[in-house]
Amino acid sequence: MKLHVVGIDLGKTVFHLVGLDSTGRAVIRKKCSRRQLLAFTANLEVQLIGMESCSGSHFLGRALREQGHEVRLMPAQYVKPYVQTNKSDFLDAEAIAEAVQRPRMRFVPIKTEEQLDLQALHRVRERWVMRRTAVVNQIRSLLLERGLTLPKGRSHVDALLPRILEDAELRLSGCFRVLLAQLKIELEQSTARIEQMDQVIQKTANENEDC
């Protein structure tokens, strides 16, 4: 069957496909898994395939391009105006098929495997930084409860925490000193992990022109 345009609504395990002919009439509706979808599109004659840019869309977009299809990704907010009131996965797929044909539609470039790798590295690094910040804030909060105020900023905690642990004149219990020492180790390990990730990110970016 030859189609003018296909819209695909992506799910985690199930995909809904709607194909339109040259008059804009929906002539095919199909619900399938990723494997079934790629098997179906392998021999499909279609001028254009549209999808919303979301998790998994870049992988599927590359797979469809390898089959020889023209594939375009769109931000979800630009597809929303074409969605009908009665929401369903097939109606969403049809809205995608309608939206992808619009001359003023904004498209998202399909990321390469290397670009997705770099994106994943940055996301993990961001989570590690947030965890380290949480440790810093907890250290400052625990010390404040014992009358010790540290200036804001990780560098101040890095510099002053060893001195606090070594200062025998501070009225800190043995239990609390052990806890502080454990938090100090956690903070140092977090920083080392982030610095190592920075090196991996830089190496990945240098080795790939698309990144």
Task: For each feature predicted by the language model, list its residue ranges.
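A detector of single, family-specific signature residues
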Residues: 1-211
